[in-house]
Curated annotation (Swiss-Prot):
Signal peptide annotation: none
Residues covered by region (Disordered): 78-108
Gene assigned in the entry: yeaH
Originating species: Salmonella arizonae (strain ATCC BAA-731 / CDC346-86 / RSK2980)
Any one Pfam family match given in the protein's UniProt record, by short name: DUF444
Protein's UniProt name: UPF0229 protein YeaH
Length: 426
């Protein structure tokens, strides 16, 4: 008889392979649930895990069953109202005695939505799937690292989903062979001695009995060697290796003027938090430059960018001028892939909008890989949007999107950073 002893330290992950299969099978429904859930989160809670709900109808398995129509014979418990062969009238729709306030239905059963928890890593992987920085190219000098997963031999620790059955059985065979080799040689010698002794005359019964006992003991010891042990287990090892890719810098330009109310600022912050998570999740050492502006623009750190209360009038060109200065000072376009994301409510001093058009057309768009403008407003577009529309017609690396409310943030983000196909990038 063979005994299997489960000594795995990671027993809680025994269903990992089933979980991964489930995530692959219902990816579309899960991504839909995630896109709806992200809009309900607070600004500071964008990157945690998520409880995902899927309608039961979407995960139900096909099955054969009897139809609702026709005549069928059933056996019911006895009662004091009916006897054998009595006909029971079919109840009218709505004739039930339930306590609910909804409309009656002929369907008497139902199920709640299926709800399960996904981890932070699973959540972010699904959130940013198929997204990439547009027009990213390799430059001549320093590089950032984009990590990709590669096979890297075998390891003695891992999750059950990565176990290598063939390598584990090979180790099991080698261990059992090594542990029982001496006993098997001794067993063969005793069996040969017993065979010789049995054919000799006169019979030596006591000696034969002793040999049989020793043979039985050796066989028992050999059988007690476990078929497989924790020591034998080998898991496929995967490691993340840097995949050379060009270094990049992202400029985040946010309007904090008085016309931007708190709700509009929160939507802008949500967009930039998504952008930051996407960059940090997908690429290593991408530099981010934060610029806040009202009548004056200022380069700030991450904390001040998201939490400063400073406000004022609106001159958008101040942020574009500052970006141009920073690019010339620190980021040579020949060595860097330069990106920018600008968020505003569209309000701007009327005489300043043509200047914004000029700065972008002559100084920034010729050197950046991609420039995205997001206008957050429910009002009609003003001069800044109209000036930028001319730029969109002139430059392929300029994109504009309109956000009206919180539900538009994630779809707009995916639209701006959707991974391009080979034909599109060419």
């Amino acid at each position: 008889m063979t005994w299997f002893i489960d000594r795995r330290l990671n027993g809680k992950n025994k269903s990992t392979v089933n979980r991964q299969r489930f995530l692959r099978r219902y990816k579309a429904q899960i991504k839909q649930s995630i896109s709806e859930a992200i809009n309900k989160r607070s600004v500071t809670d964008v990157d945690s895990g998520e409880s995902v709900s899927i309608p039961t109808d979407d995960i139900s398995e096909p099955m054969f069953h009897q139809g609702r129509g026709g005549l069928r014979h059933r056996v019911h418990p006895g009662n004091d109202h009916f006897i054998q062969n009595d006909r029971i009238e079919r109840p009218q729709d709505g004739g039930g005695s339930g306590s609910g306030n909804g409309q009656a239905s002929q369907d008497g059963e139902g199920q709640d939505e299926f709800v399960f928890q996904i981890s932070k890593d699973e959540y972010l992987d699904l959130l940013f799937e198929d997204l990439a920085l547009p027009n990213l190219k390799k430059n001549q000098h320093r590089q950032l690292n984009e990590y990709k997963t590669h096979r890297a031999g075998f390891t003695s620790n891992g999750v059950p989903a990565n176990i290598s059955v063939v390598r584990s059985l090979q180790n099991s065979l080698a261990r059992r062979t090594a542990m029982t080799a001496g006993k098997r040689r001794e067993l063969h010698a005793l069996e040969a001695e017993l065979e010789t002794l049995s054919s000799s005359e006169p019979a030596q019964l006591l000696e034969e009995e002793r040999l049989r006992r020793e043979i039985a003991e050796l066989r028992a010891k050999i059988e007690k060697v476990p078929f497989i042990d924790t020591f034998d287990l080998r898991y496929k090892n995967y490691e993340k290796r840097p995949d050379p890719s060009s270094q990049a810098v992202m400029f985040c330009l946010m309007d904090v003027s008085g016309s931007m109310d708190q709700a509009t600022k929160d939507m802008a912050k949500r967009f930039y938090i998504l952008l930051y998570l996407f960059l940090s999740r997908t690429y290593k050492n991408v530099e981010v430059v934060y610029i806040r502006h009202h009548t004056q623009a200022k380069e700030v750190d991450e904390h001040e960018f998201f939490y400063s209360q400073e406000t004022g009038g609106t001159i958008v060109s101040s942020a574009l001028k500052l970006m141009d200065e920073v690019v010339k000072e620190r980021y040579d376009p020949g060595q860097w892939n330069i990106y920018a994301a600008q968020a505003s409510d569209g309000d701007n001093w009327a005489d300043d909008s043509p200047l914004c058009h000029e700065i972008l057309a002559k100084k920034l768009l010729p050197v950046v890989r991609y420039y995205s403008y997001i206008e957050i407003t429910r009002r009609a577009h003003q001069t800044l949007w109209r000036e930028y529309e001319h730029l969109q017609a002139m430059f392929d690396n300029f994109a504009m999107q309109h956000i009206r409310d919180q539900d538009d943030i994630y779809p707009v983000f995916r639209e701006l950073f959707q991974k391009q196909s080979a034909n599109q990038s060419a």
